[in-house]
């Protein structure tokens, strides 16, 4: 059976254009399961959805924040009209905060809330094993509408530090990397620099009312040596100018933050750290 999975990043006009770390980790997980995975990004290619339709995937993942959720819905509608048999999955901060509201959209088959790495893998396994509706109930962090009723499965526990350590590295090879480096922008760095994000930890103990808290209150840290190996590989493979820590709260534990920074000083890679 042909196994094609496509992720698409909706256009968003907030001035920040950076690779989606979570989506690229999910891409790597699905690739390991033998799927042909493609990543399309409207922010860098305005014709991304047409390229996705030409790819004719079995399943599509769309990740959206509030600022891009309506465009995400438009993309789902366009894809479903062209490929009615394709399964469309919506995830990201906005669907996590409001799963019932988005699950009723006609073009959305499933909503993934919270950390999606293993939920999306379970959903791919379900797709290949006969697509029995009753089997969906066993997939944590999954929401959907069945016979007109909204169903939200139990939540999966947040990934532990040891589980974060065994996640594959982001599938940066799926990007048109030179185009990304050329066009990538963010308030933290200068356009045109060769920059990639790295994850040191997930979660934040603060309880700010404006935050959607997708990753939870408890911080889980990755192994320092593994992070150093990843950064060293990224700098070497992509000739980076800078590395950007995309953590919820990098300095929540000053001791761990100093450990990372001291290790980077020892590596002496000659890149900026942000």
What do the predicted segments below correspond to?
Residues 3-14:
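Nucleotide-activated donor-dependent transferases that construct or modify glycoconjugates
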Residues 4, 22, 26-161:
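Glycine-rich beta-alpha loop elements in corrinoid/cobalamin-binding modules
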Residues 8, 63, 114, 145, ...:
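Conserved residues at the C-terminal ends of beta-strands
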Residues 12-21, 64-69, 194:
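A short, glycine/small-residue-rich beta-strand->loop->alpha-helix junction that serves as a flexible
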Residues 14, 67-68, 94-95, 218-219, ...:
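Glycine-/small-residue-rich active-site loops that bind phosphorylated ligands and cofactors
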Residues 18-25, 226:
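Conserved alpha-helical elements of sugar-nucleotide-dependent glycosyltransferases
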Residues 156-177:
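Conserved ATP/PPi-binding loop(s) of AMP-dependent carboxylate-activating enzymes
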Residues 170-274:
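Radical SAM [4Fe-4S] cluster-binding motif and immediate context
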